[in-house]
Regions:
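Terminal low-complexity segments of carbohydrate-biosynthetic enzymes
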Residues: 23, 155-167
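A short, conserved beta-strand element in the Rossmann-like catalytic core
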Residues: 17-21
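Generic recognition of well-ordered alpha-helical segments
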Residues: 31, 78, 122, 156-160
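Catalytic donor-sugar/metal-binding loop of nucleotide-sugar-dependent glycosyltransferases
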Residues: 86-87, 108-111, 120-138
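DNA-recognition element of transcription regulators
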Residues: 117
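Acceptor/aglycone-binding surface of glycosyltransferases and processive sugar-polymer synthases
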Residues: 1-5, 10, 22-113, 140-148
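Non-catalytic, C-terminal membrane-associated alpha-helical segments of glycosyltransferases
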Residues: 146, 150-158
Length: 167
């Protein structure tokens, strides 16, 4: 419903769980002003590499992040690279800036976490550049209310394949 109500030039998405630092929107907005026909995503893996360095064997993995979500993100990165020839390091980020008119023009068919992937696929198919900016990230545990589950990873894979070839 938020997309329908949006009136500005851009839609800014922010997760409400405070895993992210709102100050990270400033570099995202700065990046947005550099060129047209783009969307900006905050990248948690790039932020972790920026803040902690390239830690072998799990680069881009937060010390408090489970191995499963990190591995699934590597699979998603690989799938975007294979299907779209684009390196998207964090399609599930909850820090995104979209062009309002373009997002309103899409017929969104999903709900839930898979909408992130549907919109990313549609942006790439429309020729919109997705620029990623490193952001800070403090992951929550299941006990603290983390919502994403292993099934969501499988749904994400299907969603990316589906929207690469359909709609």
């Amino acid at each position: 419903r938020g997309v329908q109500e949006a009136t500005g030039d851009f839609i800014l998405v922010q997760d409400a769980d405070l895993e992210y630092d709102p100050a990270d929107y400033l570099p995202m907005l700065e990046e947005l002003g550099r060129a047209e026909r783009r969307s900006v995503y905050g990248s948690r893996p790039l932020g972790i590499i920026r803040d902690c360095g390239w830690r072998w064997p799990f680069p881009g993995r937060h010390a408090d992040q489970g191995l499963g979500p990190w591995v699934m993100n590597i699979v998603l990165v690989s799938l975007f690279l294979l299907l779209f020839r684009r390196w998207i390091t964090d399609s599930l980020t909850a820090y995104k800036i979209y062009p309002t008119a373009l997002i309103k023009s899409f017929s969104v068919k999903t709900c839930g976490f898979e909408t992130d992937h549907e919109l990313t696929c549609k942006l790439l198919k429309a020729g919109i550049s997705i620029v990623e900016v490193p952001i800070a990230y403090e992951p929550r545990s299941l006990e603290e209310g983390k919502k994403i589950r292993p099934l969501d990873g499988l749904i994400a894979l299907w969603t990316i394949v589906r929207f690469r070839f359909v709609d």
